[in-house]
Amino acid sequence: MNFLPPIGQALDCLSLINCWGGNLLFPYSLGQRSLLVADVMQTPTARVYGLLSRVPAVVVGDPDLDMRFWALDNGADIAGQERLLLKLLWIKLDLAPPTAAIAEEIDRASECVKATEWRDVVDDTSAGDAPAASVLTATIRYRSFDTVRAELRAAFQNHLAIAHASGLRRAT
């Protein structure tokens, strides 16, 4: 069975799924977040993993932390499902699973991007505390679906080629 859509469709979907449960000053998608996460990452060979880290949201959605805990309390391990989908994605793309160092770099980049989103993108910030990570110097601005879609597809091709050229292929 194939649980993931073709990668082009998955990237298109990321361009359409809003972050922050729609609590936004302007349309801002998981695709834009994915591009920023990859850009923030210091290791060029690891950027494909950061770029694709939110692909499971195409299948399971992008629930907030409260929903994740509620689901877990009721027998649905969303994070576990996301990990499984990422494992399938790495196999599909002939990528080695990310190392612990790559996973940590994705986490650091994601936290930095989320802190910047809090400053630039989130509409009502009164309901919570700003993420503790440092923010980017650049301001996040609105970009159209077509722009994000094209940038995601180009970044995917570029980052996958770099990862494969560096030897980050799945062991057979």
Predicted segments with their positions:
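Metal-dependent phosphohydrolase cores
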Residues: 1-172
